[in-house]
Amino acid sequence: MSLSTIFAAMALSATAVATDTVNLPTATVTAPAKTKVELLPLDVTMINSETIERSAETSLLPIMVSNVPGLFVTERGFMGYGVSGGSAGAVNIRGVGQGNKVLFLIDGQPQWAGVFGHSLPDTYVTNGVERVEVVKGPSSLLYGSNAMGGSVNIITRRQTRDGVFGSARAMFGSFSTQKFAVSTGVKKGKFSATVAGQVDRSNGNREGSEFWLANEFMQVQYDASDNWQTGVNVDMSQTHANNPGTTQSPLLSMWTRLQRGTASIYAKNRYDRFNGGVQAYINWGRNKVDDGYAPGATPRDYLFNSTDYNMGFTLYQTVNPWRDADISAGIDFVHWGGHNWNTDKIDPSKRSAEFKAHENEIAGYVMVQQGLWHDLLSINAGVRLQHSSQYGNEWVPQAGLVASPFKGSTMKFSFGKGFRAPNLRELYLYAPANPDLKPEYMYNYEVELRQRFLEGRLNVGIALFFIDGKDMIQTRMIDGRPKNMNTGKFINKGFEVDATYIINKEWSVSANYSYLHTDTPLLAAPKNKLNAKVDYAPGDFRFTLENSTIWSLYTNLDPVVKSDYTLLDLRAAYTLHNRVPVTLMVKADNILDRHYEIVYGCPMPGITLMGGVEFKF
């Protein structure tokens, strides 16, 4: 019997993790939030600040992979995901995600590149983050396009206690890796502010895979009264990523330079019978790419440049007109687009292949929830109408119910539609472009059962899903020429199991498993995914042993190449409770020294070590 099988059986039989990752059956306050999580009959997982801090990671994506069943992210090396050709960081939920079908948000503000429509994986860092809410299944009712397969809402940290608090962390490790982070928060009366910064750099596990990232975050909040709150958020990132290509097709001098920024201003209200708010936001980027060249070939004489943006506002309100009832309604507007061009390497003033375009979208939605028999049963239904300057109208229905027939039990049944609008590249850029494309869409059917035992110390859940996708945008040969068409379709189905068990004050265990069946082979969508974790916290020490096992992961489709692997990671920390608490930490990943690939031709590192220190004040 393999080590992974023994470890999985141990974790599942004892059942599983801990308090720090929770599948929410109840409300979570999001700031700003369009609605309560409890109003959604979907499968929602929250990753809180304790989980994020204990991971010792600076990117949110690997934390999500470990803690969310059914979610998978591609990686091409030790650090950094990149953009352009050969990039990684594709996020799939239940096999849906390629082509930006999972929407990332920061405090409810959508994040994506305006021209190519892709997400921005290197910018999703732990710096300044309080928690992450992951919705598995369509979130298009609330967020519209790009939330077809699900949504990831990154909630930033807010100072809640009067005084000045902060932390500083430094870590060093394999491949000359250095990670530094500092944050501080202040609150005095009605005013609060948080400022944080992060710098990561590494030489990478392959020659030519160097990576550098800097992130700056600022949040200011003012409680104008007991019922009104206003705030401003600003988040900036700069990345330099080198890409050596694949082992089959190596590249020289391939690099990307990104400057990304996002800012928002909001006002929220909260009264006894209604709450809501308004938020205006802008997300922008400046990108420069050298696509590199093969050894022995002639270097390219130009650089690719682009600027992009998406900006808009959202207005939302929830009212409680009578007992156990909630009615939520809102309006969203977004203006997005960008500008691409090539510049000569010798004379940057020479431009070629220029492209510029934009689109506008406006939407309104309403959602109603009614609790019956003292909330033994809650019925939920909603609809969204989205209008685009390109594709016209798109209706998005969603319905479901939540039942609590026994103490500690929850049953969810849901139906929902998700969609993704074509991006500017698919519509207007390059040879296959087709300005007449319509949105991709899918219908999701889901049942979730959850039961708590032993006064909540044991939490077990299972979810079953069926996904029917239509009008996928694919490139077809029409009259001898490539053309993007709404021709693809897919069926995904499967189930997920997760369990958490707090044994006592020192011991806790957890596991989650997902099974995915697809009617066609898909990259970055493993058929079987298992994560299991054991936590031991005696006194001021803390030890975590974590297993990740993947079976039947397609890394290439022609020729067909599959990857199976088991990873074992170890984390240890010791806290000195002085006037200023100091935590010494070490983490060792892939301690079995497995050789594996997630992206074809991009070998992942063997054993890696990181050590560091954190101060809190």
Show where each model-derived region lies.
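C-terminal beta-signal and adjacent terminal beta-strands/loops
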Residues: D468-K470, S552-Y554, A572-F617
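Extracytoplasmic beta-strand/coil segments of soluble accessory domains associated
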Residues: P62-Q109
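A beta-strand signature from Gram-negative outer-membrane beta-barrel systems
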Residues: T123-S167
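Outer-membrane beta-barrel signature, preferentially recognizing the C-terminal barrel domain
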Residues: T247-Y266, R270, S306, A357-E359, ...
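Gram-negative outer-membrane beta-barrel transporters
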Residues: L372-W373, F466-D468, M485-T555, T583, ...
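Short acidic/polar hinge/loop motifs at secondary-structure boundaries
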Residues: N92, Q109-K136
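Flexible loop and strand-edge segments within Gram-negative outer membrane beta-barrel domains
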Residues: S202-S209, L213, N227-N310
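N-terminal periplasmic "start-of-domain" segments of outer-membrane beta-barrel proteins
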Residues: P25-T58, G85, F217
